[in-house]
Amino acid sequence: MSDIEIARAASKLAITQIGERLGISPGDLQPYGHDKAKISASFLHSLEDRKDGKLILVTAINPTPAGEGKTTTTVGLVDGLNRIGAKAMVCVREPSLGPCFGVKGGAAGGGRAQVVPMEDINLHFTGDFHAITSAHNLLAAMIDNHIYWGNEQDLDTRRIAWRRVVDMNDRALREMVGALGGVRNGFPRETGFDITVASEVMAILCLARDLADLEERLGQIVIGYRRDKTPVHARDIKAHQAMTVLLKEAMQPNLVQTLENNPALVHGGPFANIAHGCNSVVATRAALKLADYVVTEAGFGADLGAEKFFDIKCRKAGLRPAAAVIVATVRALKMNGGVAKTELGHEDVAALVRGAVNLGRHVENVRGFGVPVIVAINHFLSDTPAEIAALQDYAASIGVEAVLCRHWAEGGAGIEELARKVAAMADSGIADFQPLYPDDMPLFAKIETVAKRIYRAGSVTADRAVIDQLSQFEAMGYGDLPVCIAKTQYSFSTDPSLLGAPDGHEVHVRDVRLSAGAGFVVAITGDIMTMPGLPRKPAAETIRLDDDGLVEGLF
């Protein structure tokens, strides 16, 4: 059966029953149909005095077209924890329509380890992304309107930093000229679109503590600069309060369930290669009050998602992870060892051992944050006993345990061994989490620290304009912010073709952007785009409705 067929055949409980298991009354749920609901802000506020559970991060090796199954493992681990008698919840991000119709075709787990309703989660869900897109574009409209009606703030139209967004992969919108067509349409200027998941509004929603914090952060957004080079904020044109109104319900986390009827919070969705890649702080904090173990994921490999989870989300939200799981597959490590995708079905122990250095690098990096690590081998049918043994031997040689997991085929029953070991690791109290760098380190030094200690770069370079911009950010009072490096997800380097564990390479920072509301500085490297394009054969070509009105093609 395909993922969508498995999801459609699931025996789901009414969302009110899932809520009751967590102690949430029907009055504190805002249902969207029978199988999904938002949790009220008043209920979340009532949890503040409860003790926190243990926070467990699921991350992965660098992703390849062979697939790693990070979300699948995150969901499966929660099902496994509940099977062994633990009270566990999963916290994951909402999928973006862009990749759904581009290359992914869906993102809610897979096989017997999914969150449901899978179709709804992938397509519109509860409307959060629409609200974020609307709030972002309201600010864009108010900027141009402010200029049209006299430009009281003296905005320099050459230095407006706020673009528009849409939740779609559309390369034609990357760069454009707006306000053409004459005087009545405003002042023409260069602008463009980013994808919604790259929006600072998305990052703000995912890092805000509550509605008051959300409004404060929205007001701090730097929309551009005056002709005297001083910053103009969203609050200066009185946009932040109306933006908050649009985001009021989007701030409430979404409650759904796994295939095994365990509670899941699916909320927020910033990308990890062009943003910070973690689900919302509101959802994570709520789950920590409602469960003994909370399993969350961070996007792409540990060099991107895990680093940003630790250095941005945990730092800013005061979270202290108790354990980390790194997902690896035999197939992906063979690809890192030089095997072509078409040959991955054939046994090749030597290639696996060559590629395993990628896993070793990630293990070493996560340990550098003071968080204990275990490896989950996400099983594929083509894996041979010799390959699995070689991977486990390699893991043992670097002092980490690698547990074979069959959750894709067997659900929670196939991951119980990992669940027991992760629970014991989290309960041991050996975690001593520390971010990679202090707040008071200069911004460029923070970029260098991440590049050299996590990516293992030999040098970090930047044009004079980038250095000057960072100096300006520091002069404006933003020098204590963490950095969020936009980089390819496929390699430790900025070259997606450099697989394995390259070192000594150069990281060139070609642009920096201030996300004052979110609370970080974005450094853009390589060819990373904040508006992706569709591939030659987009997944949208095979997504359709069948004769019964059911969706086909999501996977």
UniProtKB/Swiss-Prot annotation:
Originating organism: Allorhizobium ampelinum (strain ATCC BAA-846 / DSM 112012 / S4)
Catalytic reaction annotation: (6S)-5,6,7,8-tetrahydrofolate + formate + ATP = (6R)-10-formyltetrahydrofolate + ADP + phosphate
GO biological process, one term: tetrahydrofolate interconversion
Gene: fhs
Listed NCBIfam families: PRK13505.1
EC nos: 6.3.4.3
Protein name: Formate--tetrahydrofolate ligase
Annotated InterPro entries: Formate_THF_ligase, Formate_THF_ligase_CS, P-loop_NTPase
Keywords recorded for this protein, A-Z: ATP-binding, Ligase, Nucleotide-binding, One-carbon metabolism
Binding site for ATP: T64, P65, A66, G67, E68, G69, K70, T71
